[in-house]
Amino acid sequence: MGAPVYGSSWPAHIPFPTSHPLWIGNLPTRANEIAQNLKAYDAIFALGGKSLITILYTEGSAVPSGIEVFQLSADARDLGRTYPTKLSVVGDIRASLTVLLSLLAPKIASRAEAYTALRKHAARDQEARRARLMAAADAEFTGPVTTPLVAGREMARAIGPNIAIVDEAPATLGHLRAFLNTSSTHQYSFSRGGALGWGMPAAVGFSLGIDRAPVVSIVGDGAALYSPQALWTAAHEKLPVTFVVVNNREYNILKKYMASQPRSASVRANRFIAMDIVDPAIDFLALAASMGVPARRVERAADIAPAIEAGIASGVPNLIEIPISAT
């Protein structure tokens, strides 16, 4: 078809190769921003039931008027649940797509030239998007404090295309996803439920579930406070999990949401109660050491990738703290 492919706005994983030229990226989590991404299209083919999850409220629908929605899901309860559809079909997604592809193949073959042109155009667009991201990260690379954009790029660069990632770091997850470049559909996992504390124990479970293979757990400092005992389990089981704590010393996503509400008492008083994780700051190196996990702090952006590469290569549980800016 040559159609662009978007991921769910709040994914449990990324079930499409991020290296594919038709991959655009995950949708945002606000309805108005999703609509902005989709407004150029005539139709959407939604696979599964939770493609357009919105987290923070904005006016209007995530699906712009005039766009036809076709939906395929294995669960009938998903169909038409959050937006009207022109056609909804119940069926196993893999089996259904296999049949659809066989039906599409002769149609694509008869339009081979147009299809090839679409693929080439998509590849050029993807290359341009990645180049813009790289340039933006380069511009911030030598700043006094590592920015979320730079941290996301350097983490993705160090991890590469084959190591499993368990992500629970809201400050950097969008940037990390933008730099992923893998043919795998199983590399990246995320907590769809949204509750804090999932990431570190999930990474331990992932490693156990894939024959004790290396896993990188990326976690925000706030989320890390909910289940740090996962460090002890990783040490006890001698699992090759590299825990990367991106530390902005605040519940950043909550603070930003509060700041976006101009009528809130917090904004009027410029006081965000219980949002700052300071006084005292958490000593993650001491916390890791208390549970038998070696740890290091990386202050310079240039040292992030080498530190993560060394952590993965060590074959033992380890923790890397990366102080980052709030924006």
Which residues make up each language-model segment?
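Glycine-rich, acidic loop regions that bind phosphate or pyrophosphate groups
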Residues: 11-121
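Redox- and metal-dependent alpha/beta enzyme cores, enriched for Fe-S-associated oxidoreductases
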Residues: 1-11, 160-163
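Short internal beta-strands
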Residues: 4-9, 70-73, 243-246
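Thiamine diphosphate
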Residues: 29, 35-40, 80-82, 88-90, ...
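Redox-cofactor binding/interface segments in oxidoreductases and associated redox assembly factors
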Residues: 45-46, 71, 167, 217, ...
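Short, basic, glycine/proline-bearing loop/turn elements
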Residues: 15-26, 44-46, 133-141, 186-191, ...
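Active-site diphosphate/adenylate-binding microenvironment
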Residues: 123-207
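Conserved catalytic cysteine-centered active-site region
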Residues: 6-20, 181, 212
